[in-house]
Amino acid sequence: MEIFVISCDGYLWERAYTSLNDAKKELQSRGFVIDFNSLDTNHYIRTIKYKDITYTNYAKIKSVYL
């Protein structure tokens, strides 16, 4: 069985997804967009700006077989 997990800034999210589309929808609902600087379409990026501080999160969807 194949499941999909999200790794964000080096940490795995606690939840796993049964479809790639569900994992993508979860990231998009949290403000992530596809990172077009990467050749892999499963790389996502989110930039948060607050006052003078800009913070960037990087996420990747990984496939795991059970």
Model features per residue range: what roles?
Residues 1-12, 45:
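Short aromatic-glycine-(Arg/Gly/Cys) micro-motifs in beta-strand/loop hairpins
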Residues 10-21:
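A short, exposed loop/beta-hairpin motif centered on an aromatic-Gly-Thr core
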Residues 30-66:
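Short, mixed-charge low-complexity intrinsically disordered segments
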